[in-house]
A protein has these predicted regions:
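Conserved beta-strand in the GNAT
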Residues: 1-7, 18-20, 25, 149-159, ...
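Conserved active-site alpha-helix within GNAT-family acetyltransferase domains
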Residues: 49-53, 59-77
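Amide-forming acyltransferase catalytic core, primarily the GNAT-like/NAT-type
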Residues: 76-168
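Conserved acetyl-CoA-binding loop-helix of GNAT-fold acetyltransferases
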Residues: 23-26, 32-45
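Short coil/turn motifs at secondary-structure junctions
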Residues: 7-9, 29, 62
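Residue-level signal for alpha-helix termini/capping positions
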Residues: 48-49, 133
Length: 168
C-alpha cells in the first residue's frame, strides 16, 4: 500500500508543490521483495514528472529512511508545563470563542500562518480531513478575536484527565 497526497509547502517564503508520501506498508509475507522500493521510485518519478520538487513523509523510523536517502526537515517538540508556570491572565482586549474544526476563519488563519512559516504545509480539503481523522471527538478549536472582532490566532486542543493537550 502506498499513497501520495498533492500538497503545497512554504519553503523559505516560496510556495512549492510537494508530494506527501503516506500509508507506506506491505503484508508481512511480501516484505523483503523490494515492492516498497519499486513503489517509492515510481512515485518519485511521477512526482518529478508533475513538477513536484519535494517529497515528504513522516517516517516511523528515522534511521531506516535516512539510510534510504531521506532527511529530516523539522522536529516535533513536546513541552510539559504545570499550570502554575503559566502567567496569570493578562488584560488583553478581545475574546476567545470555540468553533468547529471546519470553520472558515480557522482555515484562513492557518493559511495565513502557513504563508509566513517556513516548512509549513498549506492544507487543502484532503489535508483538513486527514488532520482530524484520527483525533478524539473531544478535540476543540478556539479562535482569538481582537477588540475589532478580527480573528488573530487559534489553538487546537484536547482536555483529557484534567490535562490540556495542545496540538497546535
Amino acid at each position: 500500500q502506498f499513497a501520495v497526497y498533492p500538497l503545497d509547502m512554504n519553503i523559505y517564503g516560496e510556495r512549492y508543490e510537494v508530494g506527501f508520501v503516506t500509508s507506506v506498508c506491505t503484508y508481512p509475507e511480501y516484505t523483503g521483495h523490494g515492492l516498497m522500493k519499486k513503489l517509492m521510485r515510481k512515485s518519485l518519478t511521477r512526482m518529478r514528472d508533475s513538477n513536484k520538487s519535494f517529497a515528504l513523509l513522516y517516517p516511523y523510523s528515522i534511521p531506516l529512511y535516512r539510510g534510504l536517502g531521506w532527511e529530516i526537515i523539522s522536529n516535533k517538540m513536546t513541552y510539559v508545563i504545570k499550570d502554575r508556570q503559566i502567567p496569570t491572565k493578562l488584560k488583553e482586549p478581545g475574546y476567545v470563542r470555540r468553533v468547529q474544526w471546519d470553520d472558515e476563519q480557522f482555515k484562513k488563519l492557518h493559511t495565513h500562518f502557513a504563508a509566513k512559516t517556513h516548512g509549513c504545509l498549506y492544507r487543502n480539503n484532503l489535508a483538513w480531513e486527514e488532520y482530524f481523522r484520527w483525533d478524539e471527538d473531544d478535540t476543540m478549536v478556539a479562535i482569538y478575536y481582537n477588540e475589532d472582532d478580527e480573528p488573530c490566532g487559534y489553538m487546537v486542543y484536547l482536555i483529557s484527565s484534567d490535562v490540556m493537550h495542545i496540538k497546535e
